[in-house]
Structures are given as structure tokens and as C-alpha cells.
Design a protein with these regions (language model features):
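Long, structured protein-protein interaction/assembly regions in large complexes
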Residues: 61-185
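Structured, hydrophobic secondary-structure cores that serve as assembly/anchoring elements
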Residues: 1-62, 101-116, 159-408
């Protein structure tokens, strides 16, 4: 069942989010790391989020598994998350995102474990260990054997989750399935997701992911419009905001590779922006004091000449700037430029939610001129309030919008 938490401390008290086994325990020794769900919730509250609804889909599996086990278990792990058989009319069938049918107050949807589910087997990496520096002093003669240097490398010897070509398609299809549910049933909700890290040698057609990730996403069918050719499972939609790259932050040391996905951070920024400034306002340019690095490190020019600049037209990109790390773009993944600005999509979501609530209050009233006029006034007052805040153009409310509710 969904669990409501209003603070990080509340979540921390309820969930063993930092007890994920790195591998199957051997004897009494057990190495642990944080779960990606816990990391996303932590970043959400650290960046301004005020309230989260947690839907638990099962226990975390060991980060390091036997060869081939991740691919073999992928469909099994995706099933309770995507809830293909869940019916909006049957609460008993609700699991995973199926619970959205009973949570109309939700505005942002995150799937923090999705990349990890679709990733290939993680690798162990070598970590450079430097001997501690010490002042030069005379010591008693000893053998020439170098003293062993011990240093806690934390989780830096674990590579972060990366996807191969098959995993990337699985991630795209799963995210597209969630997007399709929002477009069909929950049009006022927004899906916030981190792009997965590709393998170092990942390429699609003639494009290497490491060289031009924007072109790679286009060739892989991620940034194309949903249609019959891809089964409606592409993610280029006004219902989706993608975030990139993966981040090294002040609290990511308990994750493999000391890197966290950026979706929790982006969701927190969107949440506090809605409360403090208005959901329709852009969060581009927000400084990110907790961020100290990224994978990969993006070059940024701001004049649309680098692959990172092109990527920022469709993806919320975090990169260094002369004043520190900032969120450089606030965009949806939509292929339609009219729906590209993130604030436009969020504004429409707010209007749809208000219209739904107005309709719910009048659901069992007699349809007629009196009811139509009341609904017109309700929506007119709402749109006027948005216009006064600058969400709508026009010199007057009459220029900015019109509302009509009648027999037609």
C-alpha cells in the first residue's frame, strides 16, 4: 500500500533503505549499500520536496549477481512496477504504478529502480589508493619492504549501473509504458526519470553514446514520438521530463560508484518551485550546491554548438558553470516545440487537475444553464489567477483566455 511521508526522517524511520546487500552474504560478512529508491527520496527532500507517497514493490536484490541473472529476472522485476494488469476500477489489482488510480493528488511520478532493473551486470573497478602524506623524519633502520597502505574505498570500487543495447530498449519500453498510462488515465501527472548510463562502448548505427548522447538517443528511438511503429512506447512526450547526467553529491557516497541518478533532485526542485514561485515558472539556472561532479562530465557552451547544448533542448541537463553546478535546462522530452518548455506542461497539468476537481463537485448535479455558468465562473477565476501571476499572456484576461461551457 502507498505510504505517505512528510520528511526524510519519517522515511528513514520506516524503510531500511540503506541495507541493500552488495552481494549474497558469505558467513557473517555482509557489505551493504543504499537503495536507489532511498537515494531518490533523500534527494527529493534535500532539494525542497515536502511530501512523498512511497509504493513498495518488493525487497532489493543484491547489487552484484551471478552472470546472466539480471537479464533473466528483468521481466519479473518490471511486472510489479508497471502493473500491466491493474484496472482503475479494481483496487484489488493495484500494484506499482497501478496505485495512481487511487492517488489523484499525485503530480510527479518517479521510478527510481527502473535503470537498475534494466542494467547489465555491474563491474568491479580498480580504485587508486595513495599513501598518506607525512612529514619527513628520521626513523629506525628497517627492511626495504614497503608498508602496506590501507584505505577505505567505500563503494567506489563498484561501477554504477550501466545498460547495454538490449537494456536500453527495455528501459525505453518500460518508461514508455508508464508514459502511456499517464497519457491515457492520468493526464495531469508528470513522469520524471533519469536517463541510464550507457556502456562505455555503446553505439547505435554510426553514433557512439559517449561522443553524442543526443544523437544516440534519437537513433535508439528514445526521442521520437509515440506511434504505432514503436507500440506507443517511445518517451518523447510532454508528460515526461528526463534528467542527465548521473551526479556525485555530498550524500552519494553510499551508492555504487558514489553516483546517484538525478531524478530525485529534479523532482525536489520542481516541488519547491511549485510552492514558492508557481509550477509554470522555469527552474533552469537553479544553483546546485550539493553537486560536486558527474558521470559523464559535460562540456557546456550555452550557444548550441556542443552535443550537451543540443541534448538540453530535450533533456533537463545539469552541468558546471562559471558560478558552480546548475540546472541548465527545464524541458520536456516532447518533439513539439510548443510543448517543450517544462513550465507549459506543468501549467496544463495544474489546469487539468483544477478542471477535474470542479467537475467532481458537480458530477451528480442536473446539467443545465445554471451549472454551466457556475463551471465557467470557477474556471474563469482560476485562469485569471494564473494570468495575474504571469502564467498567461495578454494585456487582460479577455485577451489571455476564454471559457465556454454549454450544450455544444
Amino acid at each position: 500500500l502507498p505510504v505517505v511521508v512528510d520528511s526524510w526522517n519519517a522515511f528513514d524511520a520506516l524503510f531500511a533503505w540503506d541495507k541493500r546487500p552488495v552481494m549474497q552474504p558469505v558467513g557473517s560478512e555482509q557489505r551493504l549499500c543504499a537503495s536507489y529508491l532511498g537515494a531518490a527520496v533523500r534527494s527529493f527532500f534535500a532539494n525542497g520536496g515536502r511530501r512523498a507517497l512511497i509504493v513498495r514493490c518488493g525487497d532489493p536484490w543484491p547489487y552484484l549477481e551471478a552472470a546472466g541473472n539480471r537479464a533473466a529476472q528483468r521481466a519479473t522485476r518490471l511486472a510489479p512496477l508497471l502493473a500491466a494488469a491493474a484496472s482503475p476500477l479494481d483496487p484489488a489489482s493495484w500494484i506499482g504504478i497501478g496505485h495512481l488510480s487511487g492517488l489523484p493528488e499525485v503530480t510527479l511520478l518517479c521510478l527510481p529502480d527502473l535503470v537498475d532493473i534494466c542494467a547489465t551486470e555491474p563491474a568491479m573497478v580498480d580504485v587508486a589508493v595513495e599513501p598518506p602524506s607525512s612529514p619527513e623524519v628520521f626513523v629506525e633502520c628497517s627492511s626495504n619492504a614497503a608498508a602496506a597502505v590501507e584505505q577505505d574505498v567505500g563503494l567506489r570500487d563498484l561501477a554504477p549501473p550501466r545498460v547495454d543495447g538490449e537494456g536500453f530498449i527495455a528501459w525505453r519500453n518500460a518508461l514508455g509504458t508508464a508514459r502511456e498510462r499517464l497519457a491515457r488515465v492520468h493526464r495531469e501527472m508528470l513522469l520524471v526519470a533519469a536517463l541510464p548510463l550507457p556502456m562505455q562502448n555503446a553505439r547505435h548505427a554510426d553514433t557512439w553514446a559517449q561522443a553524442d548522447f543526443h544523437a544516440y538517443l534519437g537513433n535508439a528511438g528514445v526521442l521520437v514520438e509515440p506511434d504505432s511503429g514503436n507500440g506507443g512506447r517511445a518517451v518523447a512526450s510532454a508528460f515526461v521530463q528526463l534528467a542527465w547526467p548521473w551526479l556525485r553529491t555530498s550524500h552519494s557516497a553510499d551508492l555504487p560508484g558514489a553516483l546517484e541518478a538525478p531524478e530525485g533532485l529534479l523532482a525536489g526542485l520542481l516541488a519547491i518551485n511549485a510552492l514558492a514561485r508557481g509550477t509554470f515558472r522555469s527552474i533552469a539556472g537553479t544553483p546546485l550546491a550539493a553537486v560536486s561532479g558527474s558521470e559523464p562530465l559535460l562540456a557546456w557552451s550555452g550557444i548550441a554548438t556542443t552535443p550537451s547544448d543540443r541534448l538540453a533542448q530535450r533533456v533537463c541537463v545539469i552541468a558546471p558553470s562559471p558560478v558552480g553546478w546548475v540546472l541548465h535546462s527545464d524541458v520536456t522530452a516532447s518533439a513539439d516545440e510548443a510543448w517543450r518548455a517544462g513550465g507549459v506542461s506543468r501549467l496544463m497539468g495544474a489546469l487539468l487537475r483544477a478542471a477535474r476537481r470542479a467537475g467532481e463537485t458537480a458530477l451528480f448535479e442536473a446539467s443545465g444553464a445554471a451549472l454551466w455558468q457556475r463551471i465557467e465562473r470557477t474556471l474563469g477565476h482560476l485562469l485569471t489567477a494564473f494570468w495575474r501571476e504571469g502564467a498567461l499572456g495578454g494585456a487582460s484576461p479577455e485577451e489571455a483566455f476564454s471559457v465556454r461551457c454549454d450544450r455544444s
